Amino acid sequence: MFENNWRPQTSQEVLVARSKIITSIRNFFSRNNVLEVDLPVLSSATVSDPFITSFTVNHPLGDLYLQTSPEYLMKRLIAETKRDYYYLGKAFRADEVGRLHNPEFTILEWYRCDCDEFDLMDEITSLIHVVSKGRDCYKNVT
């Protein structure tokens, strides 16, 4: 029997919802003068966290690793420039597979230089409010 494996795994409704969420995140950080950075997903070093497993990519010049988080690269940027940054892009974790976990996922990570934990809590609240706009947009948008 012929299988329709070529069909997308995601509905148009989910694609539109994700696009709106991503756009609102980018607009939020742009309005707050936080610079988006596009970082490499391949690195010559892996994560130092013993509870996170990286994917290894075999390369003729040596093994490379898919990033599990943008943290290290972002902290290097901040140390050099003292500027606020965010990353919205792909990350990979080899051990996280299941109904609610995909080894490839979209991650949002940001750093503020002159904010304390209370400022960040307020910012998270504002971000969630802006992104959700009172809707249940968090449901099944993966």
Where are these regions (language model features)?
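Class II aminoacyl-tRNA synthetase-like tRNA-binding/catalytic domains
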Residues: 1-119, 129
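Metal-assisted phosphate- and nucleotidyl-transfer catalytic regions
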Residues: 127-142
